[in-house]
């Protein structure tokens, strides 16, 4: 593999710069990144200390050593508020992250495997993505982080909202949002994979709180030409952009000249950050990833039409769909009353039969004569009582992206499939609202001949599920081991900022706005998709919204990929 990088078990790739190459390709002195790290944002409904209900946003960051606006995310006493490593996942007598090729880095046992009845803790065995001691990945690293240190909204004296939010009603000492993130880095030497590192993130909501709206993001500090911790100024002529169709963001050096770094060897090239798996939404009734026809013989499902986004008059006797807190749908017939109050998704909707019109995600005029979707397409509620949550004209029918200046980035008619909860069409299609924890082989690719090898993922060990003729968790091509069993959302936001210090690390609401779906802030140095200048700029990209319920795990994976030019990068 041609990629080398330093990283830490606090979630930052490319740091500390003094410890090794910083996202280097081909040559260890050919560094491409200053810092790359995950971000998780969540909308929280809670009460302040006076009992008044309110909604706020908490965005959990990593301790990236980088310029920012207003200082680091930390307490008044200097305690970092964000993701920090979970202990027990490396050999504490040395400093390296646990890595598959070096047993000396492994812990005495793996805390997340203590409940394995046949081999508690997997002592002396690698905790692999594909199962116990399976090392068919050339090199694999593994660590865990959680947000227990992020106490900003757990104690009212730390925030200006007067909030003392406790995410876990069963453990009031649990701080943050109750999130834990497992992180794996993966590399292969094969020709097709030699120019990338794969990063796999699993975020679990360990709290007792259901979050209706969450968003995943990545912060990318660009620095083509970096070697270690020196400051040769090579960060001031980079350019960055994105391709929503291919779910990739990328960075190049404008003049293709990094001669200020005398250690650089060879051509400059480019670096990209590609979603291989984005978070999924298995609750909205919509085929977000457009794969509803990929299973042979899959039941019919309707496609969105323009008329689906017209306002609908609600009349007496009309059947509507109500959604409970577990996302179960029930039919409800509008009674012959002057006013009718219904509850869906925990929200009250008042209806005057024969007068009330309902709509969701319909086109409206936003500021500066820019047309966009009704803001109710982003609230996690079924506002028009059709059983679909947050349908969006500009996402699920006419897929259009517009930047902050009103420039259309692309605009195509590409309707998504959905479930018609009144007629029942689409409800039996396993590739609409598929999930990696629904106990279903949604895409039908589990093969009894090859995959029926048991929960440990290893053949011929006679463990649970082996040769029982049905899929078992831990076996290949089923639920958590099958990326395709997720109704993926893809790239939904991109925020470019310059200078690189314009990163509001400690300002949760500002970060939330940058991560919101539909926010595409493109650099002025890009015209018609082509760079006209280089500068010192970094970016944040996001994928959301999706529900993150208590006990739920969402997965996403990113490839840090390199190429000589944009075509080579994408290919």
Per-range role (PLM):
Residues 1-571:
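A long-range scaffold signal marking pre-active-site subdomains of enzyme folds
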């Amino acid at each position: 593999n041609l990629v080398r990088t330093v990283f830490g078990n606090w979630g930052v790739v490319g740091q500390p710069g003094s410890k090794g190459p910083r996202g280097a390709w081909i040559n260890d002195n050919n560094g491409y990144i200053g810092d790359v790290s995950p971000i998780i944002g969540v909308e929280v409904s809670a009460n302040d200390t006076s009992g008044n209900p309110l909604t706020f946003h908490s965005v959990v960051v990593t301790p990236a050593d980088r310029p920012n606006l207003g200082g680091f995310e930390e307490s008044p006493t200097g305690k970092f508020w964000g993701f920090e490593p979970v202990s027990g996942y490396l050999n504490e007598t040395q400093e390296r992250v646990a890595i598959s090729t070096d047993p000396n880095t492994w812990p005495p046992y793996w805390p997340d495997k203590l409940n394995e009845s046949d081999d508690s803790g997997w002592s002396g065995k690698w905790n692999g993505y594909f199962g116990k001691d399976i090392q068919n990945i050339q090199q694999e690293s593994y660590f865990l982080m959680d947000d227990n240190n992020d106490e900003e909204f757990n104690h009212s004296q730390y925030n200006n909202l007067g909030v003392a939010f406790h995410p876990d009603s069963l453990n009031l000492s649990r701080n943050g949002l109750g999130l834990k993130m497992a992180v794996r880095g993966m590399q292969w030497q094969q020709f097709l994979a030699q120019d990338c590192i794969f990063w796999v993130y699993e975020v679990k909501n360990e709290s007792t709180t259901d979050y209706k709206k969450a968003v995943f993001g990545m912060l990318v500090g660009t620095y083509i030409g970096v070697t270690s911790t020196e400051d040769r100024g090579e960060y001031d002529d980079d350019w960055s952009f994105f391709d929503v169709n291919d779910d990739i963001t990328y960075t190049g050096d404008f003049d293709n000249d990094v001669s200020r770094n005398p250690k650089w060897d060879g051509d400059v090239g480019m670096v990209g950050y590609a979603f291989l798996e984005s978070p999924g939404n298995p609750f909205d009734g919509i085929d977000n990833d457009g794969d509803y026809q990929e299973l042979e013989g899959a039941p019919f499902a309707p496609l969105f039409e323009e008329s689906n986004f017209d306002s609908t008059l609600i009349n007496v006797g009309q059947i509507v769909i109500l959604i409970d807190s577990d996302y179960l749908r029930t039919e409800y017939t509008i009674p012959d009353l002057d006013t009718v109050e219904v509850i869906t998704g925990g929200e009250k909707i008042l209806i005057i039969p024969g007068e009330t019109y309902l709509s969701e995600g319909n086109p409206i005029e936003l500021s500066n004569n820019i047309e966009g979707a009704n803001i109710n397409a982003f609230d996690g509620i079924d506002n028009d009582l059709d059983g679909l949550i947050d349908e969006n004209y500009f996402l699920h029918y006419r897929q259009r992206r517009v930047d902050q200046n009103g420039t259309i980035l692309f605009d195509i008619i590409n309707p998504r499939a959905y479930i018609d909860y009144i007629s029942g069409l689409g409800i039996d299609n396993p590739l609409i609202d598929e999930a990696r924890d629904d106990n279903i082989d949604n895409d039908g690719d589990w093969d009894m001949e090859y995959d029926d090898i048991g929960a440990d993922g290893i053949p011929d060990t006679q463990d649970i599920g082996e040769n029982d003729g049905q899929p078992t968790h831990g076996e290949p091509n089923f639920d958590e081991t099958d990326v395709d069993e997720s109704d993926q959302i893809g790239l939904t936001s991109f925020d470019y900022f310059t200078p690189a210090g314009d990163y509001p690390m400690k300002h949760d609401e500002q970060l939330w706005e940058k991560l919101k779906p539909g926010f595409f802030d493109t650099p002025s140095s890009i015209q018609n998709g082509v760079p006209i200048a280089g500068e010192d700029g970094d970016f944040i990209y996001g994928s959301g919204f999706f529900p993150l319920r208590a006990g739920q795990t969402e997965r996403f994976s990113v490839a840090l990929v390199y190429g000589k030019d944009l075509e080579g990068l994408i290919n």
